[in-house]
Amino acid sequence: QWNIEYVRAPEVWSAYSSSYGDAAYGYHVQVQVAVVDTGIDYTHRDLSGAVTWCVVSLSDGAIFYRGTDLKKCSDQNGHGTHVAGIVAARLNGAGVAGVAPKVTLYAIRVLSASGSGYLSDVARGIVEAVKGPDGIAGTSDDADVISMSLGGPHSDTLYEAVRYAYSYGAVLVAAAGNEGASTPSYPAAYPEVIAVGAIDSSYNVPSWSNRNPDVVAPGVSIYSTLPKNKYGYMSGTSMACPHVSGVAALVQALRLAAGKSRLSPDAMKLVLTTTARDLGPQGYDELYGYGLVDAYSAVQYALSQP
């Protein structure tokens, strides 16, 4: 799993587990990552116990559910389960491990079995994730990190949901898109969101990864979980995005474990871009943004902040 090594997550686990226990792996009672996608196969051996709550919004809100009947959020496509494994696959000696292998996940199913969906459903999913199981935004069960491996055109409804999540302190992370375009798709292009481009294991940005991201992460031939206890390789900025979501979860869990407050979305973006490993031309550039996200440097820097 070169991809987990590249973002230096195992170095966080080994450096901080003796002082902070499970927080070094992303576990904290107040830290949840919402995976806004096609659903999650919560029965997968590598995701056992990871998903605690779910939301479904499909067909422009015609199909809607929020609660703990996780079957309703099962993944008929595979994409969401693959993304979820990159964030949170458990360290159980089998299969794969995620960036934050003890973090809690919320399955927010807004894309159909074909992987497509309505921006209105994505927006609804974001809002429900922020409210969390108790239905009230601004409480400890809100999603702290919202991971969005999806993209499309601008939509006022979508932007309103992004602004809502941001106003409640949710760290929003999104795939830059795979169109080979000069700018990220939406929601990644919104200033409140961290846009993630892809690199391969040779640190090259593939031609399809949209330019001008904030940061990059591994996104080519990533091995992760698939439904029915399977595994497989997938490529795309969809795979890069959850690496960053996992790093953000590690930062928040460790800050809380250290008795500090959560980082605001702006502070998190600053920490992740400042500590990223600069690739390509010095400083920000259109291919790599600020560089490869670095979990170890990000945590170290975040814990040095008040």
Question: For each predicted feature, which ranges?
Answer:
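Active-site glycine-centered loops adjacent to acidic/histidine catalytic or metal-binding residues
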Residues: D37, G177, G236
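Stable alpha-helical elements in mature extracytoplasmic
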Residues: R8, T43, H79-V83, Y118, ...
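Sec-exported extracytoplasmic/periplasmic mature domains
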Residues: A88-N92, P101, V127-G135, R163-A170, ...
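Active-site core segment of subtilase-fold serine proteases
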Residues: W2-T104, L111, D121-A143, S202, ...
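Extracytoplasmic low-complexity repetitive segments enriched in small/polar residues
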Residues: S14-Y25, Q30, A34, G117-G135, ...
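Catalytic-core segments of hydrolase enzymes
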Residues: V83, V122, G138-P227, K269-R277
